[in-house]
Structure formats: C-alpha cells, structure tokens
Design a protein with these regions (language model features):
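Short, basic alpha-helical nucleic acid-contact segments in DNA-binding proteins
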Residues: 107-112
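A positional/architectural concept
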Residues: 2-3
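Active-site scaffold of zinc-dependent metalloenzymes
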Residues: 8-65, 76-80, 84, 89-106, ...
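Long, well-structured alpha-helical subdomains associated
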Residues: 115-121
Length: 121
C-alpha cells in the first residue's frame, strides 16, 4: 500500500489550511525522496519526511529529522502566506530562498526559547 493511502502521522493547521504530515516514508514509496530528505507539496497540502536511509552518515538522525520537518513547515507557512506561486528550486532568485528557510528552521528552537524566557509568547 502506498503511504498516501494511509492516515497521515499528523495533521497540522498552517494559517488555516490543514497539512498532512507523513514521517519515515521509504524513498521507494515516493520518487521525490530519492533526491531529498523531505518536501512540502503546496498542491496536495502534504509534508513528507524520508525514513532513515540504510547508509546513514549522521550521528543523530532523529535531530536531523526534526530539523527537516521544521524546514518543510517553514515552506508550508510561506506557501500559505502567498509566497510560492511560481517556485522553482534551481533558478537564482527562487520564491523561497533556501538559505533563509534553512536559517529559520535551524534557529527557530533558539528563538522560541528566548521568546519564552522573556514572556513574549
């Protein structure tokens, strides 16, 4: 059975739009995962995160998987904010500058901690 025929691991609300999240999806079940560890599909409102590859060089896969999930959620927020109508990932000046998406995904836990410490949440 293909993973999209199953219940998602979770559904989240992204600016009023439900996104289904599928985690630990084998690359054999989704050809897009052959080239990446996760993606956000704005047309189907799905976030898909790959399973741990057999040839994994990372010492802490779980931490990396959480980072990939945060990264794809940032894309979902950008899509639902109206940024992403003509997204192309291989052209300079793309709709979602990957370096900024990466920065937000990496730094958000630290930003959240500071916001919580100062009572800004």
């Amino acid at each position: 059975m293909n993973y999209v025929e199953t219940e998602p691991d979770r559904v989240v609300n992204v600016l009023g739009t439900p996104y289904a999240i599928y985690v630990d999806v084998p690359a054999a079940d989704d050809e897009l995962l052959e080239a990446c560890d996760g993606y956000c599909d704005k047309s189907t409102k799905r976030i898909v995160i790959a399973e741990k590859p057999k040839e994994n060089e990372l010492g802490d896969w779980e931490s990396y998987r959480r980072y990939v999930l945060r990264h794809e959620v940032v894309h979902a927020f950008l899509f639902e904010s109206g940024h992403g109508g003509n997204t192309t990932w291989d052209i300079p000046g793309e709709e979602h500058p990957e370096h900024m998406v990466e920065w937000i995904a990496m730094q958000f836990p630290k930003i959240l901690k500071v916001y919580q410490e100062i009572g800004a949440i």
